[in-house]
Amino acid sequence: MSNTETKQKILDTAQELFAKHGYSNTSLRQITSAADVNLAAVSYYFGGKERLLFELVGNTLRPLNAERLRRLDALTSDHSTEDVIRCFLEPAIDILSKDNCDIPCILGQAHREQNRALQEFIAQEVRPVAARFIDAIHTTLPHLGTAEILARAEFMIGSLLHVLHSQTAIARALAPGQQRLNDNTFIAEQLIKFCTAGFSNE
């Protein structure tokens, strides 16, 4: 295999194992054995297990955040709160709900494991993007203070991660046969409306 192929194979294998077992419960030896590479390869390409996790998450977050900002920059000056929230949520659902994307599961596992290093890495990646969105929402809802917007943004992100991780399993269990609950476009629209109402309420 070429260097590029070897590196990608390690990333793909780590993604699968982190999603299945969690970061803490996955050893480098498990990753290298499943990827059929030697143990030194992880250090060579990534510098260790933690940096491997960061690159795996960063490879998804960076294009996602770039698309969010592209859509935000395309808004007209009279944009609504819903327009801003749509720019934030739609790309996440489009990218992270793909069948082969285990990132929501990995993030959920890391949250349960209280992985502070990953949380700080994500914060560094997201902070500049979040600042843009907070400013854009504040423009449409000037009566809200920064603390109020941040708290509601926390609830929005929590709702997004729940939807991505559970795939509406609870709603589908309550009402079997509701096919629209399997439609990502429908789910995205409902989440956008739900979060818009949450931000807009006095």
Give residue spans per PLM region.
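Generic hydrophobic, amphipathic alpha-helix propensity
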Residues: T6-Q15, I31, L56-R68
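Small/polar-rich, solvent-exposed N-terminal microdomains that initiate assembly or binding
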Residues: V42, F54-E82
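Amphipathic alpha-helical segments used for helix-helix packing
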Residues: D83, S97-Q124, T168-R172
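C-terminal peripheral helix-coil segments that are non-catalytic and often amphipathic
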Residues: D94, K98, Q124-E154, S159-E202
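Hydrophobic alpha-helical connector segments
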Residues: L69-D102, A153
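N-terminal intrinsically disordered/low-complexity leader segments
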Residues: M1-N3
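Short, amphipathic alpha-helical "lid/cap" segments that border enzyme active or binding sites
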Residues: L11, N65, E82-L89, A153, ...
